């Protein structure tokens, strides 16, 4: 190694050491001035020898050119959300569900952490070097924020220590301490810039800057709390031990992580954190409780978009008092009439609130609410403002009754309320402009047909100008017609037309979700698509046949049956197909008809695969007649163990289940 290379390596190592002591251990051993001197020396040497600059150098946190837009990154392992509980009774019910699923009455060890009020991000390290960072996005696809994350000084550009995996994706929260938030807003007021409502918004705005030099000026910080991709290495068998390993590698971890061995200890931890909340120096909105054992986590598995082994125990939402100035009625996608209180604006949990949902007529009656009342407002889950109660002692003499409409406020169609349902609905269907707008917005949304560039304002204009009445009309739009909309130039119009053309190629599950059938969300749409295979089979299914689909009960089955029984809905579907909306035809072959070593077997994949992605491997196995399961049990016939296989492999060996490696799988697949 040349002397200059040796000098650069030593400087970088020294600076990383001091960054680790300062940001992770909170124990700096040199004054800031000495750190700054070392950094200046490194910058000087790198400017003289630019060919020796490395991407993990401490100088490379700042300096990338501004972006014109964020590119998308698909998460190799989905970033799931957590289910919430809001009181001790609900947490104890969660604990009971976990015990019941494990068929055990023994106390569990939980790893308890702060629920930070920031932005969830994933950071990918390859051979210890930071290579990529992304936002959570919709859990499947996020935005590439690598350049911005590199500017956050608490996040190491290079991990240090031994046994670092070849590929390690850590998940965590980027947030803004309250002191930094106040400093940003103080500067914004002084210069006439944007003043943020709360630290979370400020963190989001800082992290999503197209110019990373702006992000670098914001005092963002980070705590890691989990792992996504893991290849070419091993991690400890408990969540808490993994966090300690992360810390040893230089990643920042909250010092409030605590192991609790009984439900009572969890509740004590929750109360203590709630008591300390005002003094932490950063915003949290609860605590996260996770089963500590990775083996038990795998056994518990997931439901829909959340794990069964973890829950967010949210703090009671912050409350304020204000006055109801009026009550208006909004019409949703399925015709639901929702009363909305128009409030005297008031700050609640750092957000200026001027509207609050009243849910339905029963809720108004329960509250005894009148227009003009003084009310208590709560941000439920710190997100959706709600009216909690009426301050009857301060009711003004001129308070007015809330009169629920008998006709739709948008299209004047009759409003009906089905017996047994709390929600009143407009009967206008797609002749109702409000329902039409919301249905179309749902149809083009990211998780449905995902029409890039077609936002809410475009849909509003298309409906108001009567260019579009049904989803099929969207595919008949021309660039010329779109150019007539506000703020829509020829290039933007053509981009929307191109996006519509691209959206015609979809999946059966996305198509079903896009149709907006009542009570049919993404998971149910996927289950229906997998069970019936074709649109024709689903359209002809009886209520009884629909209930044979996993997790489909009488309510969902009835809504689905009624949707396809409605002639106007069938007409819209026919028009969509005529416009070219399509998806791959399923290949359905009975397992007993397949000549394959996997036919009819229940197979579990574990560990990392090098020759196929996990999704590809699953698809190949299913095509050969296998049923691919997520966990090992006595019903498992075969376990395929890739690199760094963990507790699933151990359980398979314990149960005496046949185990093969990836090479043998590829041989049996015919590769």
Swiss-Prot record:
Q: Which residues bind NAD(+)?
A: 32-36, 81-82, 113, 136, 173, 290, 314
Q: Which GO terms describe its cellular component?
A: cytosol
CDD domains associated with the record? BRCT_DNA_ligase_like, LIGANc
- E.C. code: 6.5.1.2
**Range of residues in the leader sequence:** none
Q: Which InterPro entries match?
A: BRCT_dom, BRCT_dom_sf, DisA/LigA_HHH, DNA_ligase, DNA_ligase_AS, DNA_ligase_CS, DNAligase_adenylation, DNAligase_N
Q: Which GO terms describe its biological process?
A: DNA repair; DNA replication
Q: Please list the residues that make up the active site.
A: 115 (n6-amp-lysine intermediate)
Q: Keyword annotations for this protein? A: DNA damage, DNA repair, DNA replication, Ligase, Magnesium, Manganese, Metal-binding, NAD, Zinc
Domain of life according to the entry: Bacteria
Binding site residues for Zn(2+): 408, 411, 426, 432
* Bilayer-spanning residue ranges: none
Q: Which Pfam families match?
A: BRCT (PF00533), DNA_ligase_aden (PF01653), DNA_ligase_OB (PF03120), DNA_ligase_ZBD (PF03119), HHH_2 (PF12826), HHH_5 (PF14520), Nlig-Ia (PF22745)
Cofactor names from the entry are: Mg(2+); Mn(2+)
User: What GO annotations for molecular function exist for this entry?
Assistant: DNA binding; DNA ligase (NAD+) activity; metal ion binding
Substrates-to-products reaction catalysed = NAD(+) + (deoxyribonucleotide)n-3'-hydroxyl + 5'-phospho-(deoxyribonucleotide)m = (deoxyribonucleotide)n+m + AMP + beta-nicotinamide D-nucleotide
Q: Which residues form the BRCT domain?
A: 593-671
Q: Do you know which SMART domains this protein is assigned to? A: BRCT (SM00292), HhH1 (SM00278), LIGANc (SM00532)
PANTHER family the record matches: CHROMOSOME TRANSMISSION FIDELITY FACTOR 18, DNA LIGASE
Describe the family membership recorded for this protein in Swiss-Prot or TrEMBL: Belongs to the NAD-dependent DNA ligase family. LigA subfamily.
Summarizing the function annotation, the protein's role is: DNA ligase that catalyzes the formation of phosphodiester linkages between 5'-phosphoryl and 3'-hydroxyl groups in double-stranded DNA using NAD as a coenzyme and as the energy source for the reaction. It is essential for DNA replication and repair of damaged DNA.
- Write the protein's name: DNA ligase
What organism does the UniProt record list as the source? Klebsiella pneumoniae (strain 342)
């Amino acid at each position: 190694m040349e002397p200059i290379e040796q000098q650069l390596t030593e400087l970088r190592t020294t600076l990383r050491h001091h960054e680790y002591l300062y940001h992770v251990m909170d124990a700096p051993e040199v004054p800031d001035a000495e750190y700054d001197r070392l950094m200046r020396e490194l910058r000087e040497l790198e400017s003289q020898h630019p060919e020796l600059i490395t991407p993990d150098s401490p100088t490379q946190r700042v300096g990338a050119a501004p972006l014109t837009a964020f590119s998308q990154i698909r998460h190799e392992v989905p970033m799931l959300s957590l289910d919430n509980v809001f009181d001790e009774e609900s947490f104890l019910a969660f604990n009971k569900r976990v015990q019941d699923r494990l068929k055990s009455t023994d106390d569990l060890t939980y790893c308890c952490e702060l629920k930070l009020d920031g932005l969830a991000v994933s950071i990918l390290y390859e051979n210890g070097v930071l290579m990529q960072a992304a936002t959570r996005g919709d859990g499947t696809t996020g935005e590439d924020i690598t350049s911005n994350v590199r500017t956050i000084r608490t996040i190491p550009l290079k991990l240090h220590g031994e046994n670092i995996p070849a590929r390690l994706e850590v998940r965590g929260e980027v947030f803004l301490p309250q002191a930094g938030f106040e400093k940003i807003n103080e500067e914004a007021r002084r210069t006439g810039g944007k003043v943020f409502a709360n630290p979370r918004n400020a963190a989001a705005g800082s992290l999503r800057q197209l110019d990373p030099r702006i992000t670098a000026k914001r005092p963002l910080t980070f705590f890691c709390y989990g792992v996504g991709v893991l290849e070419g290495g091993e991690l400890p068998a408990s969540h808490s031990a993994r966090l300690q390993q992360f810390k040893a590698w230089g990643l920042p971890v909250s010092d409030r992580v605590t192991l609790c061995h009984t439900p009572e200890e969890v509740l004590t931890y929750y109360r203590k954190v709630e008591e300390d909340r005002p003094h932490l120096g950063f915003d949290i909105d609860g605590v996260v409780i996770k089963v500590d054992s990775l083996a038990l986590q795998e056994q518990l598995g997931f439901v829909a978009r959340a794990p069964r082994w973890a829950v967010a125990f949210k703090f009671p939402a912050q409350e304020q008092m204000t006055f109801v100035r009026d009550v208006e009625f909004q019409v949703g996608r399925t015709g639901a009439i929702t009363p909305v209180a128009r409030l005297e604006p008031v700050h609640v949990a750092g957000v200026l609130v001027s509207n609050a949902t009243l849910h339905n007529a029963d809720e108004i009656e329960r509250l005894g609410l009148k227009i003009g009342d003084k009310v208590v407002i709560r941000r439920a889950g710190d997100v959706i403002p709600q009216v909690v109660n009426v301050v009857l002692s301060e009711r003004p003499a001129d308070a007015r009754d809330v009169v629920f409409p008998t006709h739709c406020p948008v299209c004047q169609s009759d409003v009906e309320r089905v017996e047994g349902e709390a929600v009143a609905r407009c009967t206008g269907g797609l002749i109702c402009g409000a329902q039409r707008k919301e249905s179309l917005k749902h149809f083009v949304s990211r998780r449905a047909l995902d029409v890039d560039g077609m936002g809410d304002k475009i849909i509003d204009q298309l409906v108001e100008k009567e260019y579009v009445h049904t989803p099929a009309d969207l595919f008949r739009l021309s660039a010329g017609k779109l150019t007539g909309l506000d703020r829509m130039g020829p290039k933007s119009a053509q981009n929307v037309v191109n996006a519509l053309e691209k959206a015609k190629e979809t999946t059966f599950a996305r198509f079903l979700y896009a149709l907006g059938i009542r009570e049919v969300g993404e998971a149910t749409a996927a289950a229906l698509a997998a069970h019936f295979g074709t649109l024709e089979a689903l359209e002809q299914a009886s209520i009884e046949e629909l209930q044979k689909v996993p997790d489909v009960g009488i309510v969902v089955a009835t809504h689905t049956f009624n949707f396809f029984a409605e002639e106007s809905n069938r007409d819209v579907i026919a028009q969509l197909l005529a416009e070219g909306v399509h998806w791959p035809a399923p290949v359905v072959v009975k397992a007993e008809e397949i000549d394959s070593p996997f036919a009819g077997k229940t197979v579990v994949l574990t560990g990392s695969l090098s020759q196929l992605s996990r999704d590809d491997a699953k698809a190949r196995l299913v095509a050969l007649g296998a049923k691919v399961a997520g966990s090992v049990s006595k019903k498992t016939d075969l376990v395929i163990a890739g690199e760094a296989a963990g507790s699933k492999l151990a359980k398979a060996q314990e149960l005496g289940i046949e185990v093969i490696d990836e090479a043998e799988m590829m041989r049996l697949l015919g590769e």
